[in-house]
UniProtKB/Swiss-Prot annotation:
Membrane topology summary: Multi-pass membrane protein
GO cellular component, one term: mitochondrion
Example GO BP: mitochondrial cytochrome c oxidase assembly
Residue ranges of every copy of the HIG1 domain listed in the record: 7-98
UniProt family annotation: Belongs to the RCF1 family.
InterPro entries: Hypoxia_induced_domain, RCF1
PROSITE patterns: HIG1
Subunit structure comment from the entry: Associates with the respiratory chain complex III/complex IV supercomplex.
Protein task: Cytochrome c oxidase subunit which plays a role in assembly of respiratory supercomplexes.
Record-given protein name: Respiratory supercomplex factor 1, mitochondrial
Length: 140
């Protein structure tokens, strides 16, 4: 790889999520389907409480928490499926996403062509300087 930074590295990208850390994507998904993280937290809470009840020796409480854990897992899976069905049924949203992807691809292609043209100009300038240098050396 080249030590020189690419012109793509200047932050002109249309897709800001491309450079964002993973937790922004997680937050975005949580906003889209808020029941899934709540179900995960409830499942973890029930699991922790069941482990605590087992440690104390309260078998009845542990069994209730195991049952609650299974119920919360089921509700979480149902929320996942429901969210997938809800977001999967919107063809307009899919069409908009495809259009955004096409626009992003065209933008990236344009940036790549500009980058290639810029590099080509740099190579031509280097060749001109090298030819001028050689000509100066020959004159000496």
């Amino acid at each position: 790889m080249s030590d020189l930074p690419s012109s793509f590295d200047n932050g002109n990208s249309i897709d800001e999520n491309e450079k964002s850390p993973g937790y922004y994507k997680i937050l975005e998904r949580c906003k889209e389907q808020p029941l899934v993280p709540l179900g995960c937290l409830a499942t973890c809470g029930a699991l922790i409480l069941s482990a605590r009840a087992l440690r104390v020796g309260n078998k009845r409480q542990a069994n209730r928490m195991f049952f609650a854990r299974v119920a919360f897992q089921g509700l979480t899976v149902a929320a996942l499926i429901g969210g997938a069905m809800y977001y999967g049924q919107d063809p307009k949203q899919k069409l908009e996403q495809k259009e955004r992807e096409k626009m992003l691809a065209r933008h990236r292609e344009k940036l790549w062509i500009e980058e290639l043209e810029r590099r080509d100009l740099e190579v031509q300038e280097r060749r001109k300087r090298a030819a001028a240098f050689r000509q100066q050396e020959e004159e000496k």
